[in-house]
Structure formats: C-alpha cells, structure tokens
Amino acid sequence: MDNYRRLHTPVALCVASPPAPPTTSWKSMEGLVQCSANHVPLSPITFLERSSKAYRDNTSLVYGSVRYTWAQTHHRCLKLASALTTHLGISPGDVVATFSYNLPEIYELHFAVPMAGGILCTLNARNDSAMVSTLLAHSEAKLIFVEPQLLETARAALDLLAQKDIKPPTLVLLTDSESFTSSSYDHYNHLLANGSDDFEIRRPKNEWDPISINYTSGTTARPKAVVYSHRGAYLNSIATVLLHGMGTTSVYLWSVPMFHCNGWCFPWGAAAQGATNICIRKVSPKAIFDNIHLHKVTHFGAAPTVLNMIVNSPEGNLHTPLPHKVEVMTGGSPPPPKVIARMEEMGFQVNHIYGLTETCGPAANCVCKPEWDALQPEERYALKARQGLNHLAMEEMDVRDPVTMESVRADGATIGEVMFRGNTVMSGYFKDLKATEEAFEGGWFRSGDLGVKHEDGYIQLKDRKKDVVISGGENISTVEVETVLYSHEAVLEAAVVARPDKLWGETPCAFVTLKEGFDNDVSADQIIKFCRDRLPHYMAPKTVVFEELPKTSTGKIQKYILKEKAMAMGSLS
C-alpha cells in the first residue's frame, strides 16, 4: 500500500453524531445535483494560476537581489512540477521533504510539489542529523531538497538511513553555485531548466487528499506527523489573509519559518491576494527593522519571544516610530501584556492569534473592540493578550470539561480544555492511529490547553495540561506566574515549571533570563519577593534559576528541557 492510500485509510474516530447524507436533506428538492460543474475539490494551488494573470507583473517574491513577478513564479512552479514528475519520478502521494530556512525555493515548492501530486514535508532546519534521519524514515520521503549550509547535516542523516538498510531519498541541492558541481546531487536550477511550463497540473481528486505533513515543534521532544488536507489549507489560507486585511499592496515579511505549520499557510494565502513576499533566512530585530524600511513591510508574524527581542533591542530605539502601519501576528504562547504594550508604543499593531500545528496554525484570534481604547493601559493590554474567538475558517472553538464534554461556564474562572471543531483541523497523525483517536475523542479536537471562557465569549489560556504545577493540591497556572515575572523591569524572558517536593508534591521553579546590565543587580530572593507581592504566596516561585532559555526554531520555549533540569534538582523540602 503506497503512502497516498495509507494516509487515506478510513478511521472511526468521532463518537458525535455524523451529519445526515445529502440524499436525506435533498428529498424535497428535486432537480438538485452535485457534479463537476458545481463541485471542484478545493486546493490552494489554484491561487497561483489566478495571481499569475490578475497580478502578472506585480512583485511576488524578494530575497536579497532576487526578485520575481507572479507570472514568473507561476512559470517556475510549473517547470519544477514538471521536472519532479518526469525527471525525478514523483507520483501522486509521494512525499517530498525540504530541509532549509526561508529561501525562495521553499516558497515555490509549496506549490510545485502539490501541483505534481506530491505531499510536502518541510523539516525543521534546526534538526540534527539523527532527527532528520528519523523523520525521513517515518515520512518515507522520496526526495529531499536541501540548502547548501545544511548539506553536511543532511548527508549524515542519509548515511544513518543507509546504515539501517533504509533507502534514502534523492537529495536535491537548492543552489546554482559553481562551488557545488558534484554529480552526486541534482540541483534545483537544473530541474527548472529541464522542466516544461506546458505541464498539466495534477489537481487533487478529493479535497481531503493530503497536501502536506508537518511535524510538531518538539516542545514535547516527541514530534508527531500532522497531515493537512488540500481543503484545510485552502480555507485557512483565505481566512488568515482576510482576517489580517492583506491585499495586493500588502508586503509580508517571512519571519515565521515555512517549516512551521507551512508558515501558518501564508505561502498560499499571499498568492491568493497577490501580496509581495520578502524572504529572510535568519530572523533578528535588525533584519525586521531593515526590511520594514527597505521594502515597506506591512505584515509579519512572530512568537512572543521574538517580540520580546524587538522591544529590548537597540534597533527599536533607532527605527521607531515606524514610518507606516505594520501589523504583527503573534502566537505560539500567551504574550505578556507588557510586551504587547511596548510593541504598540513603538508603532506596531499587534494581533494575537492562537492555534496549534494540528489546526493548520491559526485557529483563533483576539478581535480587538473599539471600547477597549477607553480602558486603562494595563486592562486594555490584558484583554488583548487573551486568545479570543474562533478563526474565520474554524467553525467551533470552546472550553469544555474533558470528562463530561459539557461546555464550562462563561465566568472567566471555571477551567476546562480548549477544543476545536472545523474544516481546518488536521486529518490526523500519520502512522499513529491511537494518537489520532485520542485527539478526536468525543467529536472534538482536544488541544491539551487549559483555559477559561469569559462573559463576552472570549477564551483565555491558563496553561498546558502537562505544564500545570500542582502544589499542596492547588493547581498553579504557570502562565499567570510568567506574566508577573515579565512585568519585572529586569526580566527579559521567563518560564515556570514544576520542581518535585516531598512536602507539597510540586513547587513552582522559575527559569529567568535577565536583561543586559542587570546581571549583578537582581537576586533570586528579590524575584521571589516581587512575585509574592503580586500573587497568592503558594503561586510564587520557590526556586529561581538565572540562565538562557532553550527554544524551538519558532521561538517557543522548550519547557521539557527545563522540566528535566528541575527534576534533577530534587526536592526543595
């Protein structure tokens, strides 16, 4: 059984009542039919063909001195899709992996691979050779596109596969440089030269066909293979650009890795609206400010840790106020209100979004209300830090009791699990039926996030299930403790985890990175007192460790590493 068929193995997952079949609802409506005239499988690859005509000469993509129009991007993707099928033998359902940062070629592969009928699998560019080898074996990738700077890691990964008698994928280099003349590898530009722009796109026969596989970020140390459908990617792409007001004149800076949730589906969304893409390989405050001024960037996305870097960077003082409106979409963890406040003081418009790899990225956003402008800053930014309402393409989002599946009271206090139901939820975990069934138990996707629902219907996260500290029988939200820590003038970054305790079971342990210049001015006792003055005493950290925090490639703090460190400390009592 090939990959495509295996991905489509039917699974009985949801115990909720299924919708009635069309024949039942149409009994009294004679003359209605579903046919190719009124039902075409949804796929985001259709956006590119339209943009090549509607925005033909508009700039589609910029990377340093490289610049393409939408007509050129469409032409290149057709030729690449042709070469994938005729030169490299890609068949429908074959997996094509990438191992690279945000280069123009990765953007093009988001179209070319599904145009050839393949399934795109973008691997985290920070993975080591052992992880790359594991993911290539699991996904059964037939090809892997690699940028030159990561070639040695990729080679080592392929060697590991060969040692296990697993056929490694064909490696294609993302370069036309003369310094890489080895005949051992195909080159991206050679493929383009051998492709034909007369290629007939392999459109999905079913909109539920897989378009991509995304491995979860690794904050749990065990990545899972999340499968996106053409339908889900199509709907999420359109919803995201509409919610954030992106149009033909918008300029999107690629600060979110395309290997993370397919870049929140923005490769396809930008094409839908004919927006301009600015690619950068490495993210830094300087790169962000430079591109805002050079290319008049209007939108970019970033984790709260990246926003924290921006507000604490010297570039922030040099380049603000901004010359024009720039919207920042932030997600990945609850943003500290203080960071949102500082970003907006600098001239950024912060839009808080929330989602998971399993929801194609964005699944909710905090819609700001005009009446919030009249509130005191502290209250206003606290409201903006909430996760908000369901995304435009997500039919339902709720906080429910995970046992009874009843919706919790909208009182801002009753904690339940955040759950989703909609067309942008993943198809499932590839090769992990048990995990898929657990995630969909009860007819909803269970996020694993704990939250509350306020009177206005807005949802607010309190913690991940696995991150809650249980001390003396009391549940402590690490998010609430971290919010207080971020309000300290000397704290650059903070994360709270559980430390084992013989008397209390667990106690809060805070890992803190101090701002430059404060290293010798702040002690652990001072941090603890600061928290005790602002929180119930049982919630205040009992341990404070000063060090740099480990992060994923998207800037999310890897709490599992900190938990291991706290566990190794042993009991405080």
UniProtKB/Swiss-Prot annotation:
Q: Name one Pfam family in it.
A: AMP-binding_C
Residues that, per the record, bind ATP: 216-224, 352-357, 449, 461-464, 556
**What pathway annotation does it carry?**
Secondary metabolite biosynthesis
Q: Which SUPFAM superfamilies match?
A: Acetyl-CoA synthetase-like (SSF56801)
Q: Which reaction does it catalyse?
A: 3-methylbutanoate + ATP + CoA = 3-methylbutanoyl-CoA + AMP + diphosphate; butanoate + ATP + CoA = butanoyl-CoA + AMP + diphosphate; hexanoate + ATP + CoA = hexanoyl-CoA + AMP + diphosphate; pentanoate + ATP + CoA = pentanoyl-CoA + AMP + diphosphate
EC annotation? 6.2.1.-
InterPro entries to which the protein is assigned, alphabetical = AMP-bd_C, AMP-bd_C_sf, AMP-dep_synth/lig_dom, ANL_N_sf
Localization annotation: Cytoplasm, Cytosol
Q: Which NCBIfam families match?
A: PRK08162.1 (NF006020)
Question: What protein am I looking at?
Answer: Isovalerate--CoA ligase CCL2
User: Which organism is this protein's natural source?
Assistant: Humulus lupulus (European hop)
What is the primary gene name for this protein? CCL2
